[in-house]
From Swiss-Prot:
GO cellular component labels: cytosolic large ribosomal subunit
Protein name: Large ribosomal subunit protein uL14
Biological process (GO), any one: translation
Pfam families recorded: Ribosomal_L14 (PF00238)
Gene3D superfamilies attached to this UniProt entry: Ribosomal protein L14
Keywords assigned: Ribonucleoprotein, Ribosomal protein, RNA-binding, rRNA-binding
PANTHER family with a match to the protein in the record: 50S/60S RIBOSOMAL PROTEIN L14/L23, LARGE RIBOSOMAL SUBUNIT PROTEIN UL14M
GO MF, any single term: structural constituent of ribosome
Family of the protein in this entry: Belongs to the universal ribosomal protein uL14 family.
Entry function: Binds to 23S rRNA. Forms part of two intersubunit bridges in the 70S ribosome.
Subunit (UniProt): Part of the 50S ribosomal subunit. Forms a cluster with proteins L3 and L19. In the 70S ribosome, L14 and L19 interact and together make contacts with the 16S rRNA in bridges B5 and B8.
SUPFAM superfamilies: Ribosomal protein L14
Amino acid sequence: MIQMQSTLDVACNSGARRVQCIKVLGGSHRRYAGIGDIIKVSVKEAIPRAKAKKGDVYNAVVVRTKKGVRRPDGSVIRFDRNAAVLLNANLAPIGTRIFGPVTRELRTEQFMKIVSLAPEVL
């Protein structure tokens, strides 16, 4: 469950290391974002000489949350940290690699590129 001011790890090689959620997209009074939701983020920590710089604002898709996601069979998939993948204006991933596992809930037409780049799909 991600809300405004939440900090997330970045699960791609775009150069950003930590980002902060500045807006949950998808409604004027939408409060929380879960796995597969798009948020607006600001880069708070980045590595030198990378594409994403500190202070840049991007769209991002949430790929892992501590809250987790409940499956129709009743099981829950949870993670230790919150993580997101940075997206460009066309909602395509900026990085060329994805770090760590992602969930099957991302298997929509919009995020198949992220699922195919991920080392593990839970």
